[in-house]
A protein has these predicted regions:
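Acidic-enriched, low-complexity/disordered segments with a strong bias for Aspartate over Glutamate
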Residues: 7, 16, 38, 50, ...
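Electropositive phosphate-/nucleotide-binding environments in soluble metabolic enzymes
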Residues: 18-21, 25, 50-53, 91, ...
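Generic alpha-helical propensity signal that fires on short helical segments
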Residues: 28-30, 58, 124-128
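Glycine-rich anion/phosphate-binding loop at the beta-strand->alpha-helix junction
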Residues: 36-118, 123
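C-terminal functional extensions of proteins
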Residues: 117-194
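Phosphate-binding glycine-rich loops and their immediate beta-loop-alpha structural context
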Residues: 1-56
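Conserved beta-strand scaffold positions in the cores of enzyme catalytic domains, especially
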Residues: 12, 40-42, 108, 143, ...
């Protein structure tokens, strides 16, 4: 986004769903140093942001009204807790976050976890965690962008969307984007998959 819109401001809101201190996130440090995020906001029990807020609502309002952000990215920091059960993972907070964005008049865009690197079947294609959030937790319709993969992988993703009726509940947007790796290299960012 920043590469094509360098004058736009991006705020990152870190929730308290994982590590609480912002400084533990090397990704945030790198993104801020590269000018890819302009301000940080920690909410709930998380701390160390440029701004600290009580909850997701005050965090979103701070991003828009005080930080003057054009785009707000919300995510937990490093680490995640999970119990191996359908509803027992801290990433379930994504549902309430998307609801809050919509309630405050924003445009909720849900980024699904999609991977083919993890050999566990439940993490092939769209992760079962993302499916749970989009099917059972979020109460509003959201935009879900899906990068177009090679046909076999894309067919798996489309099958999951249809099987869980996510294509009926939400706005699925297929994106032809071969620039992700190029953009990561351009900004000197290194990412890895579970």
């Amino acid at each position: 986004y920043k590469r094509n819109n360098p004058d736009k401001k991006i705020a990152y809101i870190m929730t308290d769903g994982a590590a609480l201190p912002l400084y533990l996130s090397m990704n945030v440090k790198n993104l801020k140093q590269n000018g890819l995020i302009d301000s940080t906001i920690t909410i709930g029990n998380a701390f160390g942001g440029d701004y600290e807020c009580i909850n997701i609502y005050t965090g979103l309002i701070t991003a828009k009204e005080i930080a003057k952000a054009d785009v707000v990215f919300v995510s937990m920091g490093p680490g995640i807790a999970g119990t191996g059960t359908k509803y027992g993972f801290t990433g379930i907070e994504q549902g309430q976050i998307l609801d809050a964005v919509k309630k405050l008049g924003g445009n909720p865009i849900a980024i699904p976890r999609i991977s083919f690197a993890d050999k566990r079947d439940r993490h092939q294609g769209i992760s079962h965690h993302s499916i749970t959030v989009f099917d059972k937790i979020v109460n509003v319709d959201v935009n879900i962008p899906i990068t177009i993969y090679e046909s076999q992988k894309l067919n798996k993703i489309k099958e999951q969307l249809k099987e869980n009726k996510l294509d009926e509940k939400h706005n699925i947007i297929f994106i032809e984007n071969n620039k992700c790796k190029e953009d990561l290299e351009y900004f000197g960012l290194k990412v890895k998959s579970m």
